[in-house]
């Protein structure tokens, strides 16, 4: 499929609706992307015609459902170029995946006197689990600072690492600033010091191709709902040798090999030992459909279109008086801003009256808000279905708000 904006927009039913009497301009895909018909129908079809509990079922529906679920594991491995399908764990989302790593790998590897590093631009999901881990183990949490332009102070990374540093947890793309970090270089620097690297890819995989083998990351995570897929499903990638050595985090059905009241329990092999209970099979199948949809359009095509649209919005926003934009000029997916002295919630409410959906608040990045000295920001985010006309409406709306509020 070539990149046809008209065709893409027709694939997303919600884009035809109106909000407050205006055509919807959905500029909040970084929070959660809209879903194409192919994804909606894939999940609906499974529940209409193919639903059954997976694993251990001898009947046809169960066997078929299991095969379809495991096919998506293989599909996910292909999507990020993992070496093996067994390096893919189905999780509820990026947040659960990071917590899984912190509670399984982290609890077994970190001890008092050890340390791990996060950056000042992380989403709370890549801060709080590590704070909790450090509180449990007595390890130290270190922070790699950022520059005023929203880039990392990478020159300070070597001095933060020592022989007791076990992990660097870093976002691929900032969910607030749109900063795309030089992940391959960061990973290489960390590995030279013997430090493993976890990458939060929640804001990256929908914008361009990710190759985990080329990056050489130890862990990589993303959520389905930001990739035009359903909520409640995500992917944790971990290198095979790391995953096989990790103990289970949650206990229950499907993650065991044997259970005995007298002899104890033995675990299933990875990745299944990390998938206790009945999985979100419908969501998994729909995530596979989302990957198929994105790949049919082509991530290179999507990246080229979105890069052009980002340049357009940054250029057009220069016409808005008293607009403060945060982050670097070169960015991916998101634009965070404030309008004069007005609170982000007020600006976002006015934009909603004009049919324009943006995100307002601290964006689960309170340390970043503190760094910039603001309680909140507005954030507009771009997806492959957004248009220059929607950008024009955003700009006109902000100019109108400035005139109304002063």
Curated annotation (Swiss-Prot):
Modified residues (N6-(pyridoxal phosphate)lysine): 226
InterPro entries tied to this protein: Aminotrans_V_dom, Aminotrans_V_PyrdxlP_BS, Cys_dSase_SufS, Cysteine_dSase, PyrdxlP-dep_Trfase, PyrdxlP-dep_Trfase_major, PyrdxlP-dep_Trfase_small
UniProt catalytic activity: (sulfur carrier)-H + L-cysteine = (sulfur carrier)-SH + L-alanine; L-selenocysteine + AH2 = hydrogenselenide + L-alanine + A + H(+)
CDD domains: SufS_like
UniProt GO molecular function: cysteine desulfurase activity; pyridoxal phosphate binding; selenocysteine lyase activity
PROSITE patterns: AA_TRANSFER_CLASS_5
Main location group: cytoplasm
GN (gene name): sufS
Cofactor: pyridoxal 5'-phosphate
Location in or out of the cell: Cytoplasm
Record key words, sorted: Cytoplasm, Lyase, Pyridoxal phosphate, Transferase
Pathway membership, UniProt: Cofactor biosynthesis; iron-sulfur cluster biosynthesis
Family, per entry: Belongs to the class-V pyridoxal-phosphate-dependent aminotransferase family. Csd subfamily.
Pfam families attached to this UniProt entry: Aminotran_5
EC number: 2.8.1.7, 4.4.1.16
Biological function: Cysteine desulfurases mobilize the sulfur from L-cysteine to yield L-alanine, an essential step in sulfur metabolism for biosynthesis of a variety of sulfur-containing biomolecules. Component of the suf operon, which is activated and required under specific conditions such as oxidative stress and iron limitation. Acts as a potent selenocysteine lyase in vitro, that mobilizes selenium from L-selenocysteine. Selenocysteine lyase activity is however unsure in vivo.
Catalytic-site annotation from UniProt: 364
Origin: domain of life: Bacteria
Protein name: Cysteine desulfurase
GO biological process terms on file: cysteine metabolic process
GO CC field: cytoplasm
Species annotation: Cronobacter sakazakii (strain ATCC BAA-894) (Enterobacter sakazakii)
Subunit-level organization: Homodimer. Interacts with SufE and the SufBCD complex composed of SufB, SufC and SufD. The interaction with SufE is required to mediate the direct transfer of the sulfur atom from the S-sulfanylcysteine.
